[in-house]
């Protein structure tokens, strides 16, 4: 069909059907001859289609609508139908809003996973398995073991180290060899294997031990060694890398064979014990008369058999090994005697360093152990008694100097008694800068002349010259010496050897001491020698410019110093010999000095007797070791090739009991043929030493009943008694004697004129073990050298340290020296294991420095990777348990449980030693630590001879058990108190010794934070010091962190600070790659990680310092300190910080201003809303902006006025209070001085908690930890969230009003299948208060408890959304449904513990304020028979005359049954030490009386306020740290409170 035909057809159709007039029709088709284009046809078609559509929309549709509205219809509905329809529509809308929109908070605050628990087990398993102490390494060699043992010498310079190791030799011991260890030959170190050291016991003990096998107190058979008929007791086992010789023996190795001091050595103080019956040496002993540090000493009787004398005092052998495949051989390395002599000749200052280490070890290890643990303090004090009984202590001052001192202090001697009665001041001092004493009575007007070296004359200027009563006195014009035997000291003495030996025999047989010389000889004159051998000095050779020209005052001071030197063992001649020989020696170190130590002793004479050693006392060469044994024993031993002689143990059975005397060669003639050494060059140098000491001498007078030194004081000094006496008292350190009167002190001895007090405290550095005071009837004149000045002088004149230390060793008893030898100084690096679970208990440890964490394996079958269904994943102590038909919880425990930590001064492992069992736990070093190890064998040997030691240790163990009970840790499973299983760890002490402040990123105010923390620690009474890199470098030098061997020096300095201070704060103020940064991390017991709470970049990422912290793999506790500019925490912001930081165990919110620079601000994310607000404000008209600001200001002022009005109405506190300082709170937590607040449950009665908290704030009691149950968790959460009492009052009242609304409760009712109400209104009421805040966001550390009825445990909640867990803690069974969390159902925590005091104690709170508002059960006795009728019960309730009106119903019985565990927990809480228990009088209020908010609040407020006021007036409130500035009390100022009470 053509196009023209189609158009014609369409036109016809339109014409017929369309009602529109013809003028709208399409034009008719033209003839076929007309030409119409295709374009025109299409155009007309689309035009027609358009008009057609318009016709439909404009005509047809409106026509249909009009017709529809014109139709009439009628609907008829009843009223009930209308009501039902409307009700359905409204209910549908309500349900949508109720469950879709109003519960959105529950979905947004629902935790899918359980909250992250602090991961404290990081790398602990690997540490226990890989870093066990004592395990041998495959790559270890002799050098490694030697370097490990050489650490006992402390800091050694490289030349000194090479000099000691240059002549080092080794000796290997076979399994059957027994070694005689003579410490005079050299210093021995075990480099391979384990060596058992035995000490000789007397015949009586050995026979008793062998015959009394049934006696449990005797030694074990494995600990005994029999050589012939002599018995030896095992003293210690020395492993590879440990020294075999005693460190005290180095003092003898440094000393030369000095003939001039031989007579003094013949009579050693420890050889003449205070008890003559305990002298171990007999005059006819052919062995060495010098005391061996390992001799039996006080342990043995004086009557030794002839066979005993031929046996050595100390032997050693390799430890037998049960494995037959391994040979029990051992290798020792020996540093010979000559090496030490060369070191002290070439490097005298390095020698003084080693001597310092000897004294340090004696103080840290031996003295601390003997005094604090073994209870043998009297053995230590006895050495000071012997010091004052020695010859030097009996030399007094020259008479003319003594009379001058008496005259200057007392005036006329007849008025001395009058002075004692009328002295106004207890102390009158005459020092080098004072010219007179204003405190003296008016009768005494004489004054000492000041010390002035420029005005000194050749004559001793006496005060008597100025008196008119002595005209022309010849004495005033004669040059005087302060020593009457002056010329005797300037000689070279050559004693006769026979005379020396005869005097030796006389002194050894006679207990009477030689008569003391009247003169005060500061030089080394030999007692007992006549002056016939004296070569007098020509006085004409002296000039007027001689150094000995002095005034009377300087003469007095020098004379006192000479007497003190004589008592201390400082010998002028021995130092002179060392100085002169040192001038001839080749010095290769800058530490060498002209005034040096003694050099080599024998000028090459030792080659004359190479196979023996020279005995100091006999003057003979003694062929050492087992040469006194029968010669048959030495046939198989090639002794010429060994440093120490040995004997074959297998040949001991054939031993002859004949006694062969030791081969000795008399070399007295050789030793005493020394040439005279000129002394003039040394005299002036040694005079300078005495002159320097005299400058720090203070001459003082103390009146009667004056205490010079308190017991346990640190800074005392030396007191030389010039006139009078000093009484020395000792008070046992026990809890019973803390509050004793001075009458309970026991007087030990009296220091007479010429004696010395304060010796041990000054020489060793130990705290004063005694108290020193003057008698009650007379004063005393003393010369005092302060302890710090004395230490500085010894460091300056370091060559004096060796004679002082040697004198100290000579005073120590044999028992102390034996203990010193057996004690082991253990160094445990961070992360290493001190002892592992299951090891044999071979000793116990005393923590000297550092910290140890106690861990225990929970699953012994840890090797099983995939246990089957029958595997016991619980720990049932290997009991037979059949769980085939019971439900098994597949919840596995952690591999390791942390039980606690041990810090400075605590003891470890004594229980296992006493019970002879294996280690029950493993101990891991938190940081580099040191311990003193007491071997089991030494403890048993001491306990047999000193039963008081066993009593002392038993008391220590009992006190530790009692302490565990006090902090709520049951010691036994069979306790009468039911155990409540919780999901928290055991108690860990927070008393940290060292605290490290480490930033997350650079730019944080670490220094300011440290200053405020140190100030807070001082305010709570801690002795604290802050260490940064600058202060450490100042003390140790600028290369303190660069040298390899300097780490020993650094660790020694840190160990000293730990002894001196209670807390050390390490401030990490250096760049990331600094050595000081790594040092701070490794030294911290607790690491405070500083972070800016507003820095979102660091919150989501990890700072550079944190990466270093993870790289070093420290196991110390790490706490995150979030610094806020304001006291506000954005909800949910804290969990962002803690989410990915598994190495953080805790966190603190601290308010502190941070000066942020532009770079830091640019790195922080800004809020989008703040950006939009900034843009709008920038484009806003300035007038509108200013008006808005005015409105904002007025609103803030109005809000402040409202708050002030509310504060006055509710007796509120001042806005800023000092006791609520965040740094004080942090200081108390770190010092184990924190205060906890525990609020109990009780429904509406808990409103009284608000009043109690108000009273606590009013009285300025700080709160550091908060915990609660039920309503107590609600009020405690409000207080912990803002730490503001105003917000607590308003929000608590708002919640009470909502809960007391009956129509809300009615609308929340449901079908009582699980509970009466759905809990919606209750949940929403709590959420309205807390919002989306999490427990981590609370300003104060907080926890609440709940009862997990799924696992039958009490859960402690410390993280997560706060409203959810507070709701769980308030879920009363039957009324509210349980809260589901992690698959478990949680109910009210009051069912198990309504007052969680034990949990607060586990958090480390020292004082706990517990507020109990629980209901009181009816305790009326019931006796209604064996059967009970319900009608009878109902009748008795309505009968006023009934005897049984209170028979409980079913609900009462169920409630009492539910709270059985809580009642017992409450009784235990009341008995817990440190608990302040409060119970307001709220028994008349019901559980749901929330409508009586104001009434209950005022009851609690009035009760707590009156009670605390009464306790304050009577002084019953405990000394809470932070309420009083204790730093002022320590400085002697008056008590000052840190808070100001608000007026009512």
Curated annotation (Swiss-Prot):
Which keywords annotate this record?
Endoplasmic reticulum, Hydrolase, Lipid degradation, Lipid metabolism, Membrane, Repeat, Transmembrane, Transmembrane helix
Membrane-related topology note:
Multi-pass membrane protein
Q: Which GO terms describe its cellular component?
A: endoplasmic reticulum membrane
Where composition is biased (Basic and acidic residues), the residues are: 537-546
Identify the EC number(s).
Answer: 3.1.1.5
- What ranges does the record list as Low complexity composition bias? 425-447
Question: Which residues are in the PNPLA domain?
Answer: 1237-1401
> What is this protein called in UniProt?
Lysophospholipase NTE1
Gene from which this protein is expressed: NTE1
């Amino acid at each position: 069909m053509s196009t023209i035909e189609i158009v014609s057809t369409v036109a016809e159709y339109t014409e017929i059907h369309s009602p529109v007039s013809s003028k709208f029709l399409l034009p008719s088709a033209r003839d076929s001859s007309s030409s119409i284009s295709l374009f025109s046809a299409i155009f007309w078609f689309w035009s027609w289609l358009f008009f057609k559509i318009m016709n439909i929309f404009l005509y047809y549709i409106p026509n249909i609508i009009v017709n529809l509205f014109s139709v009439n219809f009628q609907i008829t509905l009843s009223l009930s139908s209308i009501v039902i329809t409307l009700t359905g529509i409204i209910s549908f809308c309500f349900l949508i809003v109720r469950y879709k929109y109003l519960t959105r908070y529950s979905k947004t605050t629902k935790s899918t996973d359980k909250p992250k628990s602090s991961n404290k087990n990081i790398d602990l398993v690997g540490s226990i398995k890989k870093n066990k102490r004592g395990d041998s390494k495959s790559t270890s060699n002799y050098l490694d073991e030697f370097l490990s043992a050489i650490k006992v010498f402390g800091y050694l310079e490289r030349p000194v180290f090479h000099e000691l190791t240059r002549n080092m030799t080794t000796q290997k011991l076979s399994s059957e060899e027994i070694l005689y260890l003579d410490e005079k030959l050299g210093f021995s170190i075990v480099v391979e294997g384990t060596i058992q050291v035995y000490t000789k016991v007397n015949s009586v003990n050995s026979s008793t031990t062998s015959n009394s096998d049934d006696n449990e107190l005797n030694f074990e058979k494995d600990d005994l060694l029999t050589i012939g008929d002599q018995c030896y007791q095992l003293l210690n086992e020395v492993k590879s890398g440990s020294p075999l010789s005693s460190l005290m023996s180095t003092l003898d190795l440094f000393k030369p064979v000095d003939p001039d001091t031989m007579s003094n050595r013949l009579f050693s103080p420890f050889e003449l014990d205070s008890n003559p019956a305990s002298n171990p040496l007999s005059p006819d002993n052919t062995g060495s008369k010098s005391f061996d540090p390992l001799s039996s000493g006080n342990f043995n009787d004086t009557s030794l058999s002839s066979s005993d004398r031929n046996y050595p005092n100390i032997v050693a052998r390799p430890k037998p090994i049960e494995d037959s495949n391994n040979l029990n051989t051992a290798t020792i390395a020996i540093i010979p005697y000559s090496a030490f002599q060369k070191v002290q000749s070439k490097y005298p200052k390095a020698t003084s360093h080693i001597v310092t280490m000897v004294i340090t070890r004696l103080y840290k290890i031996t003295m601390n152990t003997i005094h604090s643990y073994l209870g043998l303090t009297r053995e230590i004090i006895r050495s000071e008694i012997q010091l004052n009984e020695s010859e030097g202590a009996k030399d007094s001052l020259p008479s003319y100097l003594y009379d001058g001192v008496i005259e200057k202090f007392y005036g006329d001697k007849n008025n001395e008694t009058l002075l004692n009665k009328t002295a106004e001041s207890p102390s009158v001092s005459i020092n080098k800068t004072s010219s007179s004493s204003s405190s003296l009575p008016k009768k005494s007007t004489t004054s000492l002349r000041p010390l002035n070296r420029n005005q000194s004359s050749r004559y001793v200027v006496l005060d008597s010259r100025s008196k008119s009563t002595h005209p022309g006195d010849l004495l005033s014009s004669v040059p005087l010496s302060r020593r009457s035997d002056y010329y005797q000291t300037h000689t070279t003495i050559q004693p006769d050897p026979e005379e020396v030996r005869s005097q030796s025999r006389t002194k050894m047989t006679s207990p009477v001491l030689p008569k003391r010389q009247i003169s005060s000889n500061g030089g080394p004159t030999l007692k007992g020698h006549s002056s016939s051998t004296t070569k007098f000095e020509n006085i004409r050779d002296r000039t007027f410019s001689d150094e000995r020209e002095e005034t009377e005052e300087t003469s007095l001071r020098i004379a006192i110093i000479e007497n003190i030197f004589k008592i201390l063992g400082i010998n002028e001649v021995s130092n002179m010999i060392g100085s002169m020989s040192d001038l001839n020696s080749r010095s290769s170190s800058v530490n060498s000095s002209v005034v040096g130590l003694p050099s080599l002793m024998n000028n090459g004479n030792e080659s004359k007797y190479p196979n023996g050693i020279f005995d100091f006392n006999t003057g003979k060469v003694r062929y050492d070791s087992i040469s006194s044994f029968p010669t048959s024993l030495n046939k198989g031993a090639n002794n010429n090739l060994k440093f120490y002689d040995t004997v074959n143990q297998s040949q001991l059975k054939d031993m002859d009991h004949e006694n062969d005397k030791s081969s000795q060669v008399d070399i007295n003639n050789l030793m005493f043929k020394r040439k005279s050494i000129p002394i003039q060059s040394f005299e002036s140098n040694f005079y300078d030493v005495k002159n320097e000491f005299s400058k720090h001498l203070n001459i003082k007078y103390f009146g009667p009943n004056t205490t010079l030194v308190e017991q346990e004081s640190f800074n005392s000094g030396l007191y030389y008694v010039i006139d009078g006496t000093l009484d020395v008292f000792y008070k046992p350190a026990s809890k019973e004697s803390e509050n004793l009167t001075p009458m309970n002190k026991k007087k030990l001895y009296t220091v007479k004129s010429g004696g010395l007090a304060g010796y041990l405290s000054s020489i060793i550095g130990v705290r004063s073990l005694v108290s020193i005071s003057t008698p009650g009837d007379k004063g005393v004149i003393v010369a005092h050298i302060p302890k710090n000045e004395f230490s500085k002088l010894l460091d300056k004149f370091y060559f004096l340290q060796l004679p002082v230390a040697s004198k100290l060793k000579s005073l120590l008893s044999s028992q102390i020296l034996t203990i010193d030898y057996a004690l082991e100084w253990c160094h445990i690096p961070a992360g290493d294991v001190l002892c592992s679970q299951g090891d044999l208990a071979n000793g116990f440890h005393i923590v000297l420095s550092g910290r140890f964490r106690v861990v225990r394996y929970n699953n012994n079958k840890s090797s099983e990777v995939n246990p089957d269904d029958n595997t016991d994943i619980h720990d049932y102590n290997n009991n037979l348990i059949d769980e085939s038909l019971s439900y098994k919880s597949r919840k596995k425990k952690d591999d390791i449980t942390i039980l606690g930590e041990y810090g400075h001064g605590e003891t470890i492992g004594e229980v296992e030693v006493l019970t002879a069992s294996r280690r029950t736990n493993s101990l891991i070093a938190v940081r580099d630590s040191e311990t003193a190890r007491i071997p089991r064998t030494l403890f048993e040997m001491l306990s047999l001879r000193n039963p008081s030691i066993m009593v002392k240790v038993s008391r220590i163990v009992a006190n530790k058990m009692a302490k565990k009970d006090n902090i709520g840790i049951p010691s036994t499973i069979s306790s009468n108190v039911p155990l409540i299983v919780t999901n928290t760890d055991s108690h860990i002490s927070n008393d940290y010794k060292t605290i490290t402040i480490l930033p997350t990123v650079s730019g944080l105010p670490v220094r300011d934070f440290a200053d405020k923390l140190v100030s807070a620690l001082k305010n709570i009474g801690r002795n604290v010091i802050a260490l940064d890199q600058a202060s450490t470098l100042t003390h140790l030098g600028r290369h303190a962190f660069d040298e390899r061997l300097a780490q020993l020096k650094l660790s020694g300095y840190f160990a000293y600070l730990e002894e001196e201070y209670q807390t050390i704060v390490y401030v990490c103020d250096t760049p990331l790659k600094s050595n000081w940064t790594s040092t701070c991390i490794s030294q911290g017991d607790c690491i405070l990680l500083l972070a800016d709470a507003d820095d979102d970049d660091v919150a989501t990422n990890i700072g550079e310092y944190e990466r270093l912290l993870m790289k070093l793999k420290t196991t110390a506790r790490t706490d995150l300190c979030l610094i806020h500019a304001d006291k506000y925490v954005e909800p949910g912001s804290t969990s962002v910080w803690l989410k990915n930081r598994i190495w953080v165990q805790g966190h603190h919110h601290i308010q502190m201003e941070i000066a942020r620079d532009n770079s830091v601000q640019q790195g922080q994310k800004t809020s989008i809303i703040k950006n939009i607000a900034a843009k709008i404000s920038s484009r806003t008209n300035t007038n509108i902006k200013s008006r808005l600001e005015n409105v904002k200001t007025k609103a803030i002022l109005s809000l402040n006025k409202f708050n002030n009005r509310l504060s006055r109405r509710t007796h509120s506190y001042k806005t800023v209070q000092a006791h609520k300082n965040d740094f004080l709170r942090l200081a108390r937590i770190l010092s184990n001085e924190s205060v906890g607040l525990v609020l109990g449950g009780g429904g509406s009665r808990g409103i009284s908690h608000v009043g109690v908290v108000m009273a606590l704030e009013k009285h300025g009691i700080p709160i550091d930890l908060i915990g609660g149950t039920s309503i107590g968790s609600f009020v405690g959460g409000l207080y912990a969230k803002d730490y503001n009492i105003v917000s607590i009052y308003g929000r608590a009242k708002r919640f009470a009003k909502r809960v007391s609304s009956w129509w809300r409760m009615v609308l929340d009712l449901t079908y009582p299948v699980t509970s009466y109400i759905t809990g919606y209104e209750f949940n929403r009421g709590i959420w309205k208060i807390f919002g989306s805040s999490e427990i981590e966001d609370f300003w104060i550390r907080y926890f609440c408890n709940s009862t997990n009825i799924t696992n039958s445990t009490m859960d402690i909640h410390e993280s997560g959304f706060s409203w959810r867990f507070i709701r769980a803690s308030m879920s009363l069974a039957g009324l509210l449904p349980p809260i589901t969390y992690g698959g478990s159902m949680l109910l009210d925590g009051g069912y198990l513990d309504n007052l969680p005091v034990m949990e607060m104690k586990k958090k480390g709170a020292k004082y706990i304020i517990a507020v109990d508002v629980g209901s009181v059960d009816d305790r009326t006795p019931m006796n209604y028979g064996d059967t009970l009728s319900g009608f009878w019960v109902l009748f008795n309730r309505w009968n006023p005359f009934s005897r049984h009106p209170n028979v409980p119903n079913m609900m009462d019985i169920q409630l009492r049954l539910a709270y059985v565990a809580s009642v017992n927990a409450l009784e235990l809480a009341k008995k817990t030490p440190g608990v302040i228990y409060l119970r307001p009088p709220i028994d008349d209020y019901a559980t749901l009386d929330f409508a009586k908010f104001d009434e209950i609040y005022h009851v609690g407020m009035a009760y707590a306020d009156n009670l605390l006021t009464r306790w304050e007036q009577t002084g019953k409130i405990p000394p809470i740290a932070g309420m009083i500035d204790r730093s002022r009390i320590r400085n002697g100022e008056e008590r000052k409170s840190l808070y100001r009470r608000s007026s009512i």
